Amino acid sequence: MVRLNSAAGSRWWAPAMAILAVALSVEAAEVARYDNYRLYRVTPHSEAQLRSVAAMEQASDSLIFLETARKLGDRFDIVVAPHKLADFTETLESDYIPHELIEQNVQRAFDEERVRLTNKRAKGPFDWNDYHTLEEIHAWLDQLASEHPKEVELLDAGRSHQNRTMKGVKLSYGPGRPGVFLEGGIHAREWISPATVTYILNQLLTSEDAKVRALAEKFDWYVFPNANPDGYAYTFQVNRLWRKTRKAYGPFCYGADPNRNWDFHWAEQGTSNNACSDTYHGSEAFSEVETRSLAAFVEKLRGKLGAYIAFHSYSQLLLFPYGHTGEHSPNHQDLNEIAEATVKSLAKRYGTQYKYGNVYDAIYPASGSSVDWSYGAQDVKIAYTYELRPDGDAWNGFVLPPNEIVPTGEETLDSLITLLEESSARGYYDEKH
């Protein structure tokens, strides 16, 4: 676990408060812009360097970490506000931390995306040629239930902090089937996640491919494309890089990380107690109504769910429990072997290479996640997290071009078939119904 250097943290705290005050105007629906924000790739090579960078992450809202500080030798990308550039580079240079300027104006990518989406609004039906708003996704789910009343049932897991519906669907071809839960969009800025989940759902419902049909009809599917509806809407309306929920924590800070808020080894590893941090774990386990509501829904399925699959981006990883400890789970060998077969299957169509492993060792310590909770608290022994395209070398991973939505969906569905076939062959769904 990274421990913060208090001296380094204090260097960043006062300036952070200044920029947070400016953020109050953003809450009034003024679109957040990142003009002349720069993107740096930083690679700590010593424990002292890692502590220094971690202190910046915890203390300053002037910096946006696109990935959480991890292990020595890992690269991670940091968006730097113009007024903070001198302090940021001075810290890196004084601590001899290797760094590289990747992009001089982050806003450029967001402007291109916004123009494209604005043009799309005047066009045709729901498809996977571009990304969709929360309202469009919810309307499409309503349409599925209307057009396929025998197979598709609308689900309502509750209301978000801002009173949006936690909407999902159940896809079923008959009683007595084991359940598979698909969770999308728990991190707001990861747009490829809901896009992939809706693509998979559509294929399960409409594909004539024999393997897809067999998969669709073997399980009951509980599908929630947007587990963080407030945050997702906020990325379209105000701040494209928003990650958390939208609950207010004091006058300056909003939201908790909904994938650090679940009641399984909550707040132990890889989280922050700073409410302004992107990895803030919340005031208590299930402090966020979104995680609390989704957990209550899943608890009602206890004994029926055979698998819980969460979709995130980015880095091209397939991960499984645990995140709070390096100790292996009881069925670690099975999970590892299934993951190995799954990533091989994923690579066949487009050559996309994934890595795999337990969360703690493969990427970084992270406690309080939905997948760890489903595994550890709900006894769902097939529990995986996909970190979708692109790989970790891409700085603009949250702005994945729309022409990669369908390929991402195709290869992910290929791999999901293998994942569920491999786990089924090991008997994991024999008593789930």
Curated annotation (Swiss-Prot):
<comment type="function">
    <text>Involved in the digestion of the blood meal.</text>
</comment>
<dbReference type="InterPro" id="IPR036990">
    <property type="entry name" value="M14A-like_propep"/>
</dbReference>
<feature type="binding site">
    <location>
        <position position="187"/>
    </location>
    <ligand>
        <name>Zn(2+)</name>
    </ligand>
</feature>
<keyword id="KW-0862">Zinc</keyword>
<dbReference type="InterPro" id="IPR000834">
    <property type="entry name" value="Peptidase_M14"/>
</dbReference>
<dbReference type="GO" id="GO:0008270">
    <property type="term" value="F:zinc ion binding"/>
</dbReference>
<keyword id="KW-0964">Secreted</keyword>
<feature type="binding site">
    <location>
        <position position="190"/>
    </location>
    <ligand>
        <name>Zn(2+)</name>
    </ligand>
</feature>
<feature type="disulfide bond">
    <location>
        <begin position="253"/>
        <end position="276"/>
    </location>
</feature>
<dbReference type="GO" id="GO:0006508">
    <property type="term" value="P:proteolysis"/>
</dbReference>
<feature type="signal peptide">
    <location>
        <begin position="1"/>
        <end position="28"/>
    </location>
</feature>
<comment type="similarity">
    <text>Belongs to the peptidase M14 family.</text>
</comment>
<dbReference type="GO" id="GO:0004181">
    <property type="term" value="F:metallocarboxypeptidase activity"/>
</dbReference>
<dbReference type="InterPro" id="IPR003146">
    <property type="entry name" value="M14A_act_pep"/>
</dbReference>
<keyword id="KW-1015">Disulfide bond</keyword>
<protein>
    <recommendedName>
        <fullName>Zinc carboxypeptidase A 1</fullName>
        <ecNumber>3.4.17.-</ecNumber>
    </recommendedName>
</protein>
<dbReference type="GO" id="GO:0005615">
    <property type="term" value="C:extracellular space"/>
</dbReference>
<dbReference type="Pfam" id="PF02244">
    <property type="entry name" value="Propep_M14"/>
</dbReference>
<keyword id="KW-0482">Metalloprotease</keyword>
<feature type="binding site">
    <location>
        <position position="312"/>
    </location>
    <ligand>
        <name>Zn(2+)</name>
    </ligand>
</feature>
<keyword id="KW-0645">Protease</keyword>
<dbReference type="GO" id="GO:0007586">
    <property type="term" value="P:digestion"/>
</dbReference>
<keyword id="KW-0479">Metal-binding</keyword>
<feature type="domain" description="Peptidase M14">
    <location>
        <begin position="130"/>
        <end position="423"/>
    </location>
</feature>
<feature type="active site" description="Proton donor/acceptor">
    <location>
        <position position="387"/>
    </location>
</feature>
<keyword id="KW-0378">Hydrolase</keyword>
<dbReference type="Pfam" id="PF00246">
    <property type="entry name" value="Peptidase_M14"/>
</dbReference>
<keyword id="KW-0121">Carboxypeptidase</keyword>
<keyword id="KW-0732">Signal</keyword>
